[in-house]
């Protein structure tokens, strides 16, 4: 499943599989402008930190074509469009990371002709896209060692191929274990209110013939108490320098339950998701989404008119609850301030 984000150079379009419609319908959402990209990000046509980063990189290419219509004044126009993309969603650090990486290419190009910049940016976006798949497969190999034969692994939200350029982070670890010949099964928490676990994780694993059972979010403690969960593996949208990890709302509760029941809790994320400029989880911005995602199921209203809603998209799991962070350079262990710094040195990213 590596074709849900496709760039068509001839059409100057980014073609996204519309994840809002899965698993019952498979339709494309075509982006030709900056606003198309921003809309796709905000309404979650595409979601998941690495996939958001890849989409943003290709969005920069579309923004360049759009800015070219301003003639000689395209530089400031392009700058504004890039910032519009970078601010589309606040929590996933890969969004700003990808835009900044494209900006760096622009800066290096200096006053090169527009056609040269487009060529450089298409190459860089393609590299970001390709590298993400390779990074996820590396994480899968490292993380597979954490999963034992016969394990049932719980995961929350969707950190699979659909949340990345391909293969997945948390689901990459699960796929890595299966590729290593281990017979395992998965519990996918439904993940209210957007139901990424029920709709997307179950869809991916079922398509790959990996045994998966969907559980309502409130069943986590019961399942662990009954000994039905041996490991928990989740993804992350931003990891602070101290190892605190922001992931889909409800992850913190799962981590607390895992500690109570002695179930190892792991986070799988590329180094690009680690924000060393954010000291701890208290400094991670948390997106507050539209109340309608909670007040309605489809077109059916389920709450009384006028009742306020909390719809935080993410929460922060403290580093103390995380047994290990699976990255492309290996599994990081506490104390994370030290192991994160060492991982960046190992990757040559100091």
From Swiss-Prot:
Instruction: Enumerate the catalysed reactions.
Output: 5-(methylsulfanyl)-alpha-D-ribose 1-phosphate = 5-(methylsulfanyl)-D-ribulose 1-phosphate
Which superkingdom does the taxonomy of this entry point to? Bacteria
Known role:
Catalyzes the interconversion of methylthioribose-1-phosphate (MTR-1-P) into methylthioribulose-1-phosphate (MTRu-1-P).
Alphabetized UniProt keyword annotations: Amino-acid biosynthesis, Isomerase, Methionine biosynthesis
Q: Which family does it belong to?
A: Belongs to the eIF-2B alpha/beta/delta subunits family. MtnA subfamily.
Stated name of the protein: Methylthioribose-1-phosphate isomerase
Site-annotated residues for Transition state stabilizer: 157
Provide the gene name from the record: mtnA
* Entry EC number(s): 5.3.1.23
Q: Where is the active site?
A: 237 (proton donor)
For the protein in the UniProt heading, the enzyme class is isomerase
NCBIfam families, A to Z: eIF-2B_rel, PRK05720.1, salvage_mtnA
For biological process, the GO terms are: L-methionine salvage from methylthioadenosine
What pathway does the annotation place this protein in? Amino-acid biosynthesis; L-methionine biosynthesis via salvage pathway; L-methionine from S-methyl-5-thio-alpha-D-ribose 1-phosphate: step 1/6
Q: Which residues bind substrate?
A: 47-49, 89, 196, 247-248
Question: Which species?
Answer: Nitratidesulfovibrio vulgaris (strain DSM 19637 / Miyazaki F)
Phylogenetic classification of the source organism: Bacteria, Pseudomonadati, Thermodesulfobacteriota, Desulfovibrionia, Desulfovibrionales
GO MF entries? S-methyl-5-thioribose-1-phosphate isomerase activity
